Amino acid sequence: MGNEFQHRTVLLDEAVDALVTRPDGVYVDGTFGRGGHSRAVLARLGDAGRLIAFDKDPRAIETAESIEDARFEIVHDSFAAMKGALDARGVGRVSGVLLDLGVSSPQVDDPARGFSFRANGPLDMRMDPTRGESAAEWLARASVQELTEVIRDYGEERFAFQIAKAIVARRAESDRLGPLDSTGELAQIVGHVVKTREKGKDPATRTFQAIRIHVNQELADLQVVLEAALSLLEQGGRLVVISFHSLEDRIVKRFLQAHASAPAVDRRLPIRAADLPSPPLKLLGRMFPNDAEVAANPRARSAVMRIAERVAP
């Protein structure tokens, strides 16, 4: 496999520092990517430690399979399958779960993967190109209403309805023009609709993000894996999540806050707060890339890392 598309791991040392509390623990990397975090975790583990990583991308799996370490195992699946996969391996509790969300640089930079609006390629956008429906296939059948909702809700795009209508209008010309199946043409359609320019952002950014999230069911999978991680963490275990846009971070923030807060007590009921079960999580804060990291890797600028520890048995 070539190395033409390089990936810089964001918040590498900070994430591993927050995650690894026991060198003999069992850890999970929910998004192997190109292995930056996984290799750093393995470097911190002792002989009895163990790391189980997940990824949907076949190229990530190829990279992971080059790691010759008896303490490491890669699972070709979404992190949403984490609970079942660990149950199947006899793993009931883990010392830490790391989730580095979003798309990796090799996925974005390779036009053949269909994530990029900067270089023309097939309109795919699947993290795992061997499974599920591609972006082109979904765009070929989605209604104006469904397109509008996805682009509005997952892209926070105020021109969602106009973009949806333009996509459907282009689809009506398929007999003459052929199918809408290239990233370049989709970006062009969006560019004709979105006349305003956000500083440093291509007009197609929000629409491509929205379609990618929908095709890969990213937010639904995130909800599933957060619940799984909470159930898997041992007392003292850490959950570390790196998000790259507000939709992801909002879900993570609300989940962590909900499980780090004591339930409200109705003063009219004969129940003392001290009699209620303690919340399972303690929030350990959040971190952002420093100026030097952002200068070296501009894609890190939107990253936020949230850390929580399981305090209940």
Swiss-Prot record:
The keyword Cytoplasm applies. S-adenosyl-L-methionine binds at G35, G36, H37, D55, F79, D100, Q107. Belongs to the methyltransferase superfamily. RsmH family. One of its GO terms (cellular component) is cytoplasm. Keywords: Cytoplasm, Methyltransferase, rRNA processing, S-adenosyl-L-methionine, Transferase. This is Ribosomal RNA small subunit methyltransferase H. GO terms for biological process: rRNA base methylation. Specifically methylates the N4 position of cytidine in position 1402 (C1402) of 16S rRNA. It comes from the Bacteria. It catalyses: cytidine(1402) in 16S rRNA + S-adenosyl-L-methionine = N(4)-methylcytidine(1402) in 16S rRNA + S-adenosyl-L-homocysteine + H(+). InterPro entries: RsmH (IPR002903), SAM-dep_MeTrfase_MraW_recog (IPR023397), SAM-dependent_MTases_sf (IPR029063). Pfam families: Methyltransf_5. It is found in: Cytoplasm. Its EC number is 2.1.1.199. One of its GO terms (molecular function) is rRNA (cytosine-N4-)-methyltransferase activity. It is an enzyme of class 2 (transferase). The keyword Transferase applies.
